[in-house]
Regions:
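Loop-to-transmembrane helix entry/capping segments in MFS-fold secondary transporters
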Residues: 48-49, 138-148, 250-251, 335-345
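Cytoplasmic helix-loop-helix junction between adjacent transmembrane helices
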Residues: 112-154
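Helix-loop boundary and gating motifs at the non-cytosolic
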Residues: 2-63, 213-258
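A late C-terminal transmembrane helix in Major Facilitator Superfamily
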Residues: 336-367, 376
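C-terminal ends and interior cores of transmembrane alpha-helices
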Residues: 87-103, 290-302
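Intracellular juxtamembrane helix-capping segments at the cytosolic ends
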Residues: 37, 121-135, 240, 320-333
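C-terminal transmembrane helical hairpin of 12-TM major facilitator-type secondary transporters
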Residues: 281-325
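Helix-to-loop junctions at the C-terminal end of transmembrane segments
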Residues: 64-78, 167, 267-280, 364
Length: 402
């Protein structure tokens, strides 16, 4: 089931190992803030709707800045933006925490959340573009993207657990402050790891199209698919803190995230070693249908153990789906727009998560957790069927005679 040969070949590169390890800490705030901001605002305002709105503002800002930063990086390289954005993001998180704890008006909190998201450092997009531009063969690239997906899942495992620990010890505010520290120190370490050099040279073209990668029909459809799937993920994930809160043990939310993320990371790594014949859009379709079924199982759960089991079974599809989405976009995007293409992916994914969190928060307060998960299942089913509209590409080259 799991062939480690390509992973051994991948990490025989000592510099790449250092870069990958250095990329973890500055990305932990993604996993921490998605939950930490929700719990921090909810603890101060008593409203999941307000909490979902603030999280949506933060994620929306991540979405807005991503293509702009991506185009800057494609045209000038990542050196000039990485460290300044890391420091500004840490400062913005400090100001956001102050605004929430001092019970500032909702408008001020929303502006603060947007400001924090608008200056997030481009760690993930730099890593993915580095893989896309490298001279690695298709098998190594699939494993590299699988590692990338597993790291992101790891951030969503460790991040919520750190938030849960701070809730046991003190307040969700401490989780956001810890995220600020990780953003500043982690970005500095990542910038010194060799990643900015390894990213390569800027690929100059005679005339860059103003739409960048969006001029490609296949890229546009792949990105819209990512948007739909991320909306479903947002609807699903907002139910985790809501279920924990309804059970009377809010700190359990970290265990729900872990129950979902650990199987996701394991399956993501396993998927990276597989050489499947199916086109990537059909692999993504299968993952979407699995997530739809898992959401229905979670909706039917009333006991904590059953909900955790539903989270675990649902999570099995997340890792493979995220890896396949990255591979699909990497195959469809023109090489000179590789960083910008991945930033558009980040943009629409964050918009979808934000919309899902916002809509889910409203639905939970008005209709309950189960209804929200049923809506998630319906959306995932529609998104899965839309996979067939994306041009077919394969993750790895098939051997002759296959």
């Amino acid at each position: 089931m799991l062939d480690l040969t390509t992973y051994r070949a991948l990490f025989a590169d000592h510099e790449l190992r250092r870069i990958v390890l250095a990329s973890v800490a500055p990305r932990l705030p993604i996993g921490m803030n998605a939950l930490g901001l929700t719990l921090l605002v909810q603890s101060q305002s008593g409203s999941f709707a307000h909490a979902g709105l603030v999280s949506a503002a933060y994620m929306g800002a991540l979405a807005v800045q991503a293509p702009v930063i991506g185009r800057v990086v494609d045209q000038n390289g990542p050196r000039g933006v990485m460290l300044p954005l890391g420091m500004l993001h840490a400062l913005a998180l400090l100001l956001l925490t102050l605004a929430v704890t001092q019970r500032a008006p909702l408008a001020v909190v929303l502006v603060s959340a947007f400001a924090a998201g608008i200056v997030f450092p481009p760690i993930s997009m730099t890593i993915r573009a580095m893989y896309r531009k490298s001279d690695m063969n298709d098998a190594l690239k699939q494993s590299a993207f699988a590692v990338e997906a597993a790291i992101m899942e790891g951030c969503f495992i460790i991040g919520p657990l750190l938030v849960s620990l701070t809730m046991l010890a003190a307040s969700p505010a401490f989780a956001v402050l810890a995220a600020a520290l990780l953003a500043s120190v982690g970005t500095w370490h990542f910038a010194r790891s060799g990643a900015l050099v390894r990213w390569g040279r800027v690929e100059y073209v005679a005339q860059r199209h103003w739409l960048g990668p969006l001029q490609s029909f296949g890229v546009r459809r792949a990105l819209l698919l990512s948007l739909c799937l991320s909306m479903g993920i947002g609807l699903n994930e907002i139910t985790l803190p809501a279920f924990a809160n309804a059970s009377g043990y809010p700190a359990r939310v970290g265990w729900f995230y872990a129950a979902m993320s650990v199987p996701s990371a394991i399956m993501g790594v396993a998927y990276g070693s597989w050489r499947l014949r199916w086109p990537l859009n059909r692999q993504i379709m299968l993952s979407g249908l699995w997530l739809a079924g898992g959401s229905l199982l979670m909706a039917a759960s009333t006991q904590t153990w059953a909900f955790m089991l539903g989270c675990a079974l649902t999570g099995l599809a997340f890792g493979p789906m995220m890896t396949a989405l990255s591979l699909q976009l990497g195959k469809l995007a023109p090489s000179e727009y590789s960083t910008e293409a991945f930033t558009w992916s980040t943009t629409l994914f964050m918009i979808g998560l934000g919309v899902g969190f916002w809509a889910g928060g409203m639905m939970i307060e008005r209709h309950g957790i189960a209804t929200t998960l049923v809506a998630c299942s319906a959306l995932m089913t529609i998104a899965a069927l839309c996979c067939l509209l994306v041009p077919e590409v394969r993750g790895t080259a098939q051997p002759e005679g296959a």
